[in-house]
Amino acid sequence: MHTRALYPGTFDPITNGHADLIERASQLFSHVIVAIASNPSKKPLFTLEERVEMIKKVTADLPNVEVVGFTGLLADFADEQNATILIRGLRAVSDFEYEFQLANMNRRLNPKLESVFLTPAEENSFISSTLVKEVALHRGAVSGFCHPVVEQALRDRLGKKN
């Protein structure tokens, strides 16, 4: 069975937690689309194009993973991509309530779309893009939290030694 799954997010930047979920999803589904939301209201550190390129490099060894940017409603984009599975990561119980509401809204907007929740590996359970950026901003080491490509991009963008 050919199942197209969509893993959406802002990924500003992609972390080891995201990369772990992408790799595991690529083993569960025949095709995984990493859908990077434009979302200018979040004021991202990296442009959409930069995030797409970073994630393409991080996932280069996963042949069934495609990386694309998108704008608009996720439910509509999933329909355009013929995706029937929406992958979401749950780091803690605190994530569940919001994700539950989001899953119900997406199902209402696109009845063919089923949400599948994956939990991160224990060593990644506390990592978030926001925390990685904060550590990098204060010259902390981020190598344990993100791919070397991302670490270098953070150094280049923030102009500091991490």
Swiss-Prot record:
Gene Ontology MF terms: ATP binding; pantetheine-phosphate adenylyltransferase activity
Spell out the reaction equation it catalyses: (R)-4'-phosphopantetheine + ATP + H(+) = 3'-dephospho-CoA + diphosphate
Task: Spell out the protein name for this chain.
Answer: Phosphopantetheine adenylyltransferase
Name the gene for this chain: coaD
Chain's role: Reversibly transfers an adenylyl group from ATP to 4'-phosphopantetheine, yielding dephospho-CoA (dPCoA) and pyrophosphate.
Source organism per UniProt:
Alteromonas mediterranea (strain DSM 17117 / CIP 110805 / LMG 28347 / Deep ecotype)
Q: How does it assemble?
A: Homohexamer.
Q: Which GO terms describe its cellular component?
A: cytoplasm
Q: Which cofactor does it need?
A: Mg(2+)
Q: Where is this site: Transition state stabilizer?
A: H18
Please tell me where ATP binds in this chain. T10, F11, H18, G89, L90, R91, E99, N124, S125, F126, I127, S128, S129, T130
Q: Tell me its family.
A: Belongs to the bacterial CoaD family.
Q: Where in the cell is it found?
A: Cytoplasm
Q: Which GO terms describe its biological process?
A: coenzyme A biosynthetic process
- Chief location of this protein within or outside the cell: cytoplasm
The superkingdom listed in its UniProt entry is Bacteria
Its EC number(s): 2.7.7.3
Where along the chain is substrate bound? T10, K42, L74, R88
Query: Which pathway does UniProt place it in?
Result: Cofactor biosynthesis; coenzyme A biosynthesis; CoA from (R)-pantothenate: step 4/5
Q: Which UniProt keywords apply?
A: ATP-binding, Coenzyme A biosynthesis, Cytoplasm, Magnesium, Nucleotide-binding, Nucleotidyltransferase, Transferase
